[in-house]
Amino acid sequence: MQVSVETTQGLGRRVTITIAADSIETAVKSELVNVAKKVRIDGFRKGKVPMNIVAQRYGASVRQDVLGDLMSRNFIDAIIKEKINPAGAPTYVPGEYKLGEDFTYSVEFEVYPEVELQGLEAIEVEKPIVEVTDADVDGMLDTLRKQQATWKEKDGAVEAEDRVTIDFTGSVDSEEFEGGKASDFVLAMGQGRMIPGFEDGIKGHKAGEEFTIDVTFPEEYHAENLKGKAAKFAINLKKVEERELPELTAEFIKRFGVEDGSVEGLRAEVRKNMERELKSAIRNRVKSQAIEGLVKANDIDVPAALIDSEIDVLRRQAAQRFGGNEKQALELPRELFEEQAKRRVVVGLLLGEVIRTNELKADEERVKGLIEEMASAYEDPKEVIEFYSKNKELMDNMRNVALEEQAVEAVLAKAKVTEKETTFNELMNQQA
């Protein structure tokens, strides 16, 4: 076997291989012997068919199969010998085959980039320092009560957290526009659903009033014909409602799994959940900064084959989220996913190099801790832990999570990490 390797472009490679004629003939004869042992031909007992008849009937197809097998096996031998690491599936380009002559073919593919990590010491990471305070717990209890609130009609003026039912008609330069009209529209104030100024124009009014408000559509508004335009909305305020928050009764508290129904028990449960969320948020915040710094410090070429593969993964994930099938997924435009796919490949290659250079292996104690932390959010943590322990795929996934964490920690060990005090709400809003 003769082998030559050339670079086509960037990460592209072409391996040209020549297989000696005698190697081909030896392999063909060997395979014909195997065929002769199994074939049945009228007039001959099984395994007793003369070789010349076997060769006459099956020689062409056997030779084709043998060439395909030799091409594959010799390519594998060649990349092992040349220490080449292909990325993605190779493309075989067979040359012209002539009986009794050497056979030359080529294989085209991309290779993984050679990654030499740099700039780790210049990466800057800001680690949030946060405590869950009593005030944070109070705020979360208010949120829980608001989620369970009922609405009661009121006679007073509209306030910041009320709910209103309105008819409205919008116009620009005295002309109504598409999508600018609605009847019995229910609007919960303070959620930012409407354009700036709309809710402010309703506040202070009472049910039964009709009035006009002036607003300006944002420059980034989705409708091209309305961007930056001044508009008027004629409003008929039909109903105003205010929230009625439930009291922290034992019955209410038990809905959240606090069996004794006590306020103290609920506060303890809420605090525990908030601290778990906080731990995850801090970890994610630090991780995202470390990875962003790693990507910015290391500009690497990315094999197109890996990007294509990642795009297919993202397409299928998108289809699953929206109830589509695999055929529909593959029809989604690649432009929707290309940037995200490339970044995921880059991050994977860089973290892979961190793992390789630091000789990291998944820490089983960390894996156990991650599973326990995840399971603590469920009603029966022991059942979840046992389920994971019996599922190899889930355990492997969690080992990958642990290994990624260890890689990020290896980056942080060389980065410039500073601490900054912040609040629970500020951190959570950054995560949103």
Swiss-Prot record:
Keyword set includes Thylakoid: no
Span of domain PPIase FKBP-type: 161-246
Any one annotated GO CC term: cytoplasm
Reaction catalysis annotation: [protein]-peptidylproline (omega=180) = [protein]-peptidylproline (omega=0)
Class in the EC hierarchy, top level: isomerase
Keyword Protease found: no
InterPro entries: PPIase_dom_sf, PPIase_FKBP_dom, Trig_fac, Trigger_fac_C, Trigger_fac_C_sf, Trigger_fac_ribosome-bd_bac, Trigger_fac_ribosome-bd_sf, Trigger_fact/SurA_dom_sf
Main location, first listed in the record: cytoplasm
Protein name: Trigger factor
Subunit-level organization: Homodimer and monomer. In vivo most of the ribosomes are in complex with monomeric TF. Uncomplexed TF, however, is in a monomer-dimer equilibrium with approximately two thirds of TF existing in a dimeric state.
Gene3D superfamilies: 3.10.50.40, Trigger factor ribosome-binding domain, Trigger factor, C-terminal domain
UniProt record similarity statement: Belongs to the FKBP-type PPIase family. Tig subfamily.
Classification via Pfam families: FKBP_C, Trigger_C, Trigger_N
Annotated EC: 5.2.1.8
Compartment list: Cytoplasm
